Swiss-Prot record:
Its main location: plastid. The chain crosses the membrane at residues 41-61. It is a single-pass membrane protein. One of its GO terms (cellular component) is photosystem II. The gene is psbH. It comes from Huperzia lucidula. It holds the Pfam family PsbH. One of the components of the core complex of photosystem II (PSII), required for its stability and/or assembly. PSII is a light-driven water:plastoquinone oxidoreductase that uses light energy to abstract electrons from H(2)O, generating O(2) and a proton gradient subsequently used for ATP formation. It consists of a core antenna complex that captures photons, and an electron transfer chain that converts photonic excitation into a charge separation. This is Photosystem II reaction center protein H. The lineage of its organism: Eukaryota, Viridiplantae, Streptophyta, Embryophyta, Tracheophyta. Phosphorylation is a light-dependent reaction catalyzed by a membrane-bound kinase; phosphorylation occurs on Thr residue(s) in the N-terminus of the protein. GO terms for molecular function: phosphate ion binding.
Length: 74
């Protein structure tokens, strides 16, 4: 059955579009992994910053933290 599916996929004609041709160079590194940690620490800092931001916003919304002189009306 798998050979039939691959035979069918070989016969189908792939439609090439302008957008596809423009984006093809961006996909040329598909499947390749850079050695080491890469940008993982930057992503960790971004995630931690977003978590702190979310906690601050939730505490302000929940009135756990009040800001003096700033009226909150929601």
């Amino acid at each position: 059955m798998a050979t039939q599916i691959s035979d069918i996929s070989r016969r189908t004609k792939v439609k090439s579009t302008g957008l596809g041709n423009a984006l093809k160079p961006l996909n040329s590194e598909y499947g390749k992994v850079a050695p080491g940690w890469g940008t993982t620490p930057i992503m960790g800092v971004a995630m931690a910053s977003f978590a702190v931001f979310s906690v601050i916003i939730l505490e302000l919304y929940n009135s756990s933290v009040s800001l003096d002189g700033i009226p909150v009306s929601w």
